[in-house]
From Swiss-Prot:
Tissue: Abundantly expressed in ripening fruit.
Main localization (coarse): secreted
S-S bonds: 32-244, 80-90, 95-102, 150-233, 155-216, 163-179, 183-192, 193-203
Species annotation: Prunus avium (Cherry)
Protein name: Glucan endo-1,3-beta-glucosidase
Coiled coil residues, start to end: none
Amino acid sequence: MMKTLVVVLSLSLTILSFGGAHAATISFKNNCPYMVWPGTLTSDQKPQLSTTGFELASQASFQLDTPVPWNGRFWARTGCSTDASGKFVCATADCASGQVMCNGNGAIPPATLAEFNIPAGGGQDFYDVSLVDGFNLPMSVTPQGGTGDCKTASCPANVNAVCPSELQKKGSDGSVVACLSACVKFGTPQYCCTPPQNTPETCPPTNYSEIFHNACPDAYSYAYDDKRGTFTCNGGPNYAITFCP
């Protein structure tokens, strides 16, 4: 009986150890001088996270574990409040759920995104900071541990300061609170890399995407910015996401 118990206990510990070996812990830090409300979105058919939205005060931190495999994105909403009807609304990157939790809704552009593809078994992770849906605040993604390149993906600059007038999203006080991407603004194949311009050869960078790239060379600036915007790390690292790095 004792021998059987030892075997069962040993097997249970092995399963627990294996099950958690490659789960990624995502650490969030808000270095912005204002409150943000991060949102999470899991891609279809992937395990869901424990929360889809939360509040993060200036200088506050938060941790979230991802199951594996996992594919999804994070962003931060700004200028949020509860209106007279009790609906939670945000000035930028709102997910239109009416709540702090996004409940499966993505960010309404413009929004700076942190995107992840984390495989099972400690394989090669892919991650990026994307401005394909526009920009609303600076952000960085830094692997913690892991092997290989494991470089920081980031957009530390305030792109709003160099945003062309035709792409600007303004707040109620007239200030620029976010910067639309050309795809979101104009919706044409030239900027969205949709047919008939749906290959890297037929959809090169544009003057608008180069504004994003020049401000944030370590971020995805448009749909086919794979060589400049995609980062990899092996060995099951954890990640630190910093708002206003």
